[in-house]
Amino acid sequence: MRVPFIIPDGGGFVKLDAGWIFRYHGPDDEVMTMQYLCAPMEGVTGDLFRQAQRQTFPAADSYYTLFLSPTANRTFSPRELREIEPAHNAGIRVVPQLMGHCAEDFLWMAGQLADMGYDEVNFNLGCPSNTVTVKKKGAGLLTEPDLLRRFFDAVFAACPL
């Protein structure tokens, strides 16, 4: 059995080389429980991986999708639909990861995901890819604090999740 290499990141998370994240909980770190969260890795951790992993090993507590990008046309791409289709994720907890800068589009997608049965979304503010940041998405939104504040004000006021 291969043991993954653990790299502490200093923020309460520990990343493993296979995309896993451990998150610690507990008052004053006295009694800690561990959650196994599967981080998204493009081309690796899609719906087929999640089902194969669940059938072969104990399932992770949550699996995060590759980012979904809400757009003004208010549709899901075929890839996005495949990732979030409840039938493709039976028996596991999946957390859709959203990336964007328009609160109205985010709220539309969050509403659609709530209607599909999801109870949580993850908002990506960390992607450093230039093709993402030039669109004011991912880490690119961090360079626009006023836009980010307006985004969060609107989302926190109306998000169904």
Regions found by a protein language model. Give the residues of each.
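A structural motif
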Residues: 58-60, 118, 160
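Glycine-rich tight-turn/loop motif centered on a GG-T
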Residues: 130-147
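Short terminal hydrophobic/aromatic SLiMs and anchors at protein ends
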Residues: 5-7, 25, 29
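Glycine-rich, positively charged N-terminal anion/phosphate-binding segment
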Residues: 43-112
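Non-cysteine beta-strand/loop elements that form the S-adenosyl-L-methionine
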Residues: 65, 119-128
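Alpha-helix-loop-beta-strand connector modules within alpha/beta enzyme cores
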Residues: 85-91, 142-161
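Extreme N-terminal starter segment of soluble prokaryotic enzymes
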Residues: 33-36
